[in-house]
Amino acid sequence: MDSAPLLALTLIVGVPVLFIATRIFLYPFTGLCLWVLLLPVTKTMADLAGYPQDEGPIMLQKLTLADPVLLLTAVGALLNGTGSSSRVTDRQGRRIIILLAAFCVANVASAALGETGTESLIELATNFWLCLSLVLICQLLGSPDRLRRTLTAWEGAGVVGCVAGGVGTLLMWRGNINNLLVQDGRVAGLFHGINQLQSFVVAVIPFFCAGMFSRAASRSARVLYGALVLVGFAGVVGSGSRAGVVIAALSVWLMLLFASPRLALVWTCAAVLFAGSAWQVLGKHLDELPYGIRRSFSYVQEDNLELDELSRGRADQLQTFYTVFAEHPLVGVGPGGFAAWVPRVVPGGKAQEMHNSYLGVLGETGAIGGLIMLALLADAMLRTFRFLQWASRARDPDALMAAQALLVSYASILMYGMLNYGLRQRHFWFVIALTVALPHVYMRWRAGARVAERRTRPFYGVVPCVE
C-alpha cells in the first residue's frame, strides 16, 4: 500500500479513536456508557483480525473492544475522580463488592494449591477485570441522572444485541450458515460465543417488557418495545438453545404477570389449549427448518428425556464434577482447570468447561470459593426482593416497574446459569451492579425528593411510569 492511502487510513481511524480515548480519560462516565453499549459486542481481537474460532495468540483471544474502554475509564476515574459526590456505599452494596473481592482471593488460593498452575493466570485476570468493572460501576452511578443515562445505554445495547440476533436468524433462514452473525448454523450475533447471546437476551428482555407493558408509554413506543422483544426472542430461537427459549418466554410471562395478572392468566389458558395442536404441527415440519431453529425445538421429537440421551456432553461433565469435587473438596482444581478433567474421568469425553455455573465454581474453586460466590448471588437476590418490597410500599409506579424488571432479569440469568457457565460474562456482572446501585440511588433520590416540590424521576424515559 502506498504511503498516502496508508496515512489517510491512519488518520481516518486514529483521529476518532484518539478523541474517544481523550474524552473517556477526562470524563470517565462517558467510558462507562460506551462500555455498556459494547456489552453485546464480544467478538475478540482474534476474531476481528481474521483468525479462525478459538485460534490465534491467547491474549488476542481474550481481548475485546470493551477492554481498552474499561481500562481507560478506570485510569480516568483514578486520576481525575469519578465526578460524582454520591457513591453506592450502603452496607449491603459494600458487602456484595467485598464478597466478589473475597472470591478473587479464593481464586488465587485455588490456582496456587490446585493443579492448573500458570494456566489459571488468564482466569485470574478475567476475575480481577470483572471485580474492577463492578467497583467502577458502583463508583460512577451515584446520581439519578447518571443511572438514567446508564439504563438508556443498557437499552441501546439491548437493541444492538437483539437486532444482531434477529438479522442472524434471517440470514440463517435464507441458507447463510457461516458469517459474522452465524456460527455453523447457529446464531451468535456479535458475541464470541453462542451462549452469550442467549444469556444477554434473557437479561435485557425484562427491561423491554417494562416499556411494552407501561401504560404511560406512547403507543408507538410500546409497539417498538414489543418488536424488540420479538426480534430478541427470534435470535434466541435461532441460536439453537432449548433452555434459552423456555427462559426467554418465562421472563416475558413474568413481566406480563406483574403488569396484568388477569391478562397473564388468559394467555396461559390460551397456551394450554392450543399447545397440543401447535406441538404436533411443529413436530411434522421440524425437519424442514434450519439447524439452529430445529435444535431449539428438538425435544419435540424426543421420546426419552434422560440427560444421557438429550446431552451426552452434560452427562459427562456431571460425572466429572462428582470425581473432581470428591478429590478436591476445599480449593478445587484451579480456575479454568475443569475442562481438562473431563477426558481423564470419562474415556472419549470432550474437554470443555462445566455448563452449570454453580457446579463449575464448586469444581474449580472448591467449597471455599463456591460458598463465597453462592453467598454473593444470594445477597444480590435478597437485595432485589427488598427493593421490590420497598417500591410496592412506596406506591411509586416508576420504582415498581424498575424493581420488577431488575428482579426478572436477575432471576432469568440465574436460571440460565444452571445450564450454561455465565459467571465470566460481562453483562451478568452489569446486572449484579444494577442490583447494587439501583436500589441505593432510587431510595436516596426518594428521600431527598420529599423536600423538593419539583423533581425529575431517575428512570423517566427509560422505565416509563405506570400512572
Model-predicted regions and their roles:
Residues 72, 376-379, 405-467:
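Transmembrane alpha-helices of multi-pass inner-membrane enzymes
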Residues 55-65, 183-196:
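Short aromatic-rich membrane-water interface segments that cap or initiate transmembrane helices
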Residues 1, 15-23, 74, 101-112, ...:
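Alpha-helical transmembrane segments of multi-pass inner-membrane proteins
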Residues 178, 301-319, 323-365, 388-391:
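Long extracytoplasmic/lumenal interhelical loops at the membrane interface
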Residues 63-69, 95-105, 117-142, 158, ...:
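Aromatic-anchored transmembrane helix interface
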Residues 365-412, 439-440:
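Hydrophobic transmembrane alpha-helices and their immediate junctions
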Residues 1-82, 109-113, 430:
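N-terminal signal-anchor transmembrane segment
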Residues 181-190, 279-319, 340-343:
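Flexible juxtamembrane loops connecting transmembrane helices in multi-pass membrane enzymes
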